[in-house]
Amino acid sequence: HDRSALWAEIQRCGVKTFGEPQADNFRWPLNRSEAKARLDEFITHVLPQFGNWQDAMHTEEPFLFHSLISFALNTKMLNPREVVAAAQQAWRLGHAPLPAVEGFIRQILGWREYVRGIYWSQMPGYRELNALDQHAPLPDWFWTGKTQMRCLAHAVGQSLTEAYAHHI
């Protein structure tokens, strides 16, 4: 996919970013058909193993058994209902085992949608909550990934280079 026009517009508008954004590293769908294709690819090729490997991480494989559909969900190119229905259909047709489908649906409904619902039901006051009474700024490594804690260096570094570091 040629993302050069989008990238030129981002640069022209002076969109502030952190990390290492690059036009050829922008792998997210730009329209519904691309988002649907990403979902279909996950359901067909990855979902059958999702139950066993949904929490796996590897320093050389940033995406592993993840669906890579969060961007499409967040930008409304996909909706959670159709994502769940696609996973259910894979199980009904015998293309994915129940533990994999259950694990994926739990990530969508039991985590993503639940947390999103709590967040928006409590806004705008939720933004100001500080239950731990924390006032210190985030450490520099949060923005650079430069820390001796290997797991955090990898997770933050991956976020900076891939704009991705989570399940969905």
Where would I find each of the regions flagged by the language model?
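Specificity-determining recognition surfaces
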Residues: 1-63
